From Swiss-Prot:
Organism for this UniProt entry: Gluconobacter oxydans (strain 621H)
Family: Belongs to the UPF0260 family.
InterPro entries, per database record: Puta_zinc/iron-chelating_dom, UCP006173
Transmembrane segments: none
Protein name as annotated: UPF0260 protein GOX1406
Length: 163
């Protein structure tokens, strides 16, 4: 029997979540909205600090989420099916953490009730990125931090699914 107090992300498999539950997993860090390169020889993902032109680099939110696919045709809509295939999500991404059997971090908005923790933990891109409208060549903006665990955040615990 499932514990009535367990949060949904600990009991509901990703592919069975409602759209509201799925969307609420996004912590709003903005790391997935940074441009990435892929090494042609090694297939390694190379991160940059260059944000999609629709990302507000302070709030870390899309300025036109509802119409983003028309304005940015290669914007990815993350689904449980796609989640199984992609390798470029940052290590602190909630979707990746849950996919890989870990719990949400302590600073996640679903745990704290606000978005302050995602910024204070160092998980977000807040004021650490530049819009692609002003950046110039991506090669001039290579960074390691988007692909690393946030400096000011403890690691997550393995998730033992309830139920």
């Amino acid at each position: 029997m499932t514990s009535p107090t367990a949060p949904f992300w600990q009991t509901v498999p990703l592919d069975q979540m409602s759209s509201e539950q799925w969307e609420s997993l996004c912590d709003g860090c903005g790391r997935c909205c940074l441009n990435k390169l892929r090494d042609e020889d090694t297939e390694e993902v190379i991160y940059t600090n260059v944000a999609c032109r629709l990302l507000d680099t302070h709030t870390c939110r899309c300025t036109d989420y509802a119409d983003r696919h028309r304005k940015v045709p290669d914007c990815v809509t993350l689904t449980p099916e796609l989640l199984a295939e992609i390798d470029w999500l940052p290590p602190s991404c909630s979707y990746r953490l849950l996919r890989d059997g870990f719990d949400l971090p302590d600073w996640h908005p679903l745990r704290t009730g606000n978005e302050k923790g995602v910024h204070s933990s160092g998980a977000s891109v807040q004021d650490r990125c530049i819009s692609e409208r002003r950046a110039g060549p991506l090669e001039d903006h290579l960074e390691d931090w988007p692909g690393e665990w946030p400096d000011r955040s403890p690691l997550c615990h393995a998730l033992k699914r309830k139920g």
